[in-house]
Amino acid sequence: MSLGLSHKYNKLCYIQCVTGDELKNARKASSWTQAQAAARLGVTQAYLSMVERGERAVSSELASKAVRVFEVPATALPLSRYQARVRDAGFFQAMLGSLGYPGFAYLRGSVRLNPVELLMDALDADDLDSRVTEALAWLPLAYPHLNWDWLTANAKLRDRQNRLGFVVELARQAAEKDGRSQLEEELAARVAKLEPSRLVKEDTLCRESMTQAERAWLRDHRPKSAEHWNLLTDLSVEQLDHVAL
């Protein structure tokens, strides 16, 4: 399944942050002059020229515009230091829809968030809407070139590596089920890198409000992968209706 990115620059490069040189490459891939690109980006040609030469930094606002104008992947959106925050179900649904998740396609809008930041926000949530939880494994499948170093580091800082490991394992199983062997191998390698930091402490997959009775039931009825990652969840790859690519 396509990620919904048709521009030829998408076939040339997947970038995790926007630099002046990458803006220049994107502009040339679009066969645009500096003047044409500047007009579309809402800046002066002189300013764009300085950015492309590295004399001015790419601001977050310009990076966001570039993602829309050049149609580069959302993984190009700038990342900052992670801060825990409370997001409601509507936020996650809208952002997933904007990133192309089929289950929330009807919410597709123009505002996007870097998928790695969205995934971290979700993994750090105490409670998520079940439909959002089911969508998490889609993010590593649709955006395999996300910034794994940033994600892993922040997951460990927040003690969320078990949640991350389980979600990536679900994505790996989905890739295997879909016959995408190369992606399956890449995701398996990501899971393996998380193994040494696996926590013994029991956790939920973003369902902290579940009752003690539910917790007791899940200890006996969870998939092996959930047990391995010490998570109380019955989510399995068979339940993921919209993750196949």
Q: What is each model feature region?
A:
Residues 78-106, 236:
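Short, charged recognition helix plus adjacent turn
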Residues 21-40:
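Short basic helix-loop element that most often maps to the first helix and adjoining turn
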Residues 41-57, 77-81:
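Recognition helix of helix-turn-helix/homeodomain-like DNA-binding domains
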Residues 42, 61-76:
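DNA major-groove recognition helix of helix-turn-helix/homeodomain DNA-binding modules
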Residues 2-10, 105-197:
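Mid-protein regulatory/catalytic core that forms ligand/cofactor-binding pockets
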Residues 183-245:
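Charge-dense, extended regions
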Residues 23, 34, 45, 60-63:
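Helix-turn-helix DNA-binding elements, focusing on the entry/boundary residues of the two helices
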Residues 1-18, 25, 214-228, 234-235:
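N-terminal flexible/basic segments that precede or flank functional cores
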